Amino acid sequence: MNLNDIEVNSITRRFEDTVAVDNVSMNVARGELFGLLGPNGAGKSTLTKMLCGMINPTSGTIKVGGYNIQDYPMKVKELLGVVPQDIVLYDYMNARENLTFFGKLYGLSGGKLRNRIEELLKFTQLDEKAVKRHISTYSGGMKRRINIAAALLHEPQVILLDEPTAGLDPKNKLALWEMIRTLNKEGKTIMLTTHMMDEAEELCNQVAIMDKGKIIALGSPRQLTKKVKMENIITILPDKITSKLMEATQKIAGVKSSYRAYDENEKIETLKIITERAEDILPDIVSAISSVGTKILSVELSRVTLEDVFILLTGRSLREEEEPL
């Protein structure tokens, strides 16, 4: 029995002079919740399209459920459920009508299709009143739930989720996270692509960090943060962040890195400083910030996160976006 549901071996994909995916190899074990992380332009979308069979690799092989995707494309499609980032639903239909339409595309019909639709509507936790409304009246979170349900109609073993919580408010994001956890507990193998490191830390037991077409780190969130020797992050909320402030903090002895970070929940921009000895150099940091005429509104000490690991490995933030590949 094959223990890996996804096997990517030396995959490269070129678009004329651009190498979008560069000699990538990785495995996703059966029942794993695997995160593929990286900024726009990292090559995540191209790799996902190759996993779905939408485009072919320039070189290398991909297997899903033990089947080579180029030799057995129809078998792989039976095994895969794909949830794209964009909502793929018909606005003028209600939830049940949408699921009926997509179920027929999978070859389902009659009582089997009706029963499966009712199972999935129960899974989405939408009430009957909502189910009867047109999709055009749904919130973003409700649309995402039906989008996921549509990908589950044929009971796939492997589920690909492309940025499933993009654009959702915190409440709907947490609801989607719970759906993903439930699917994984049922034994589904899930590969989640995201640029949100907190999402990967919360959900995934294995992650690959991708940048400029390459896998630059692979392991559990704990393993990856342990690889970083710096133990602490100092998060400072200043009254303003200027280039002079950034230069001043980067010159402090003992500072490994300093960078801007945007807190999506609080809607504020903070200054993050990575160091091995936070308590020792905190007075120097306060002095440097004051010297450039900046006021400190708050200071917080925390552990290294996956986003901090990414910045240390690449030298840039996830929000320094490039064109998606």
Predicted features and spans:
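ABC transporter nucleotide-binding domain
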Residues: M179-E276
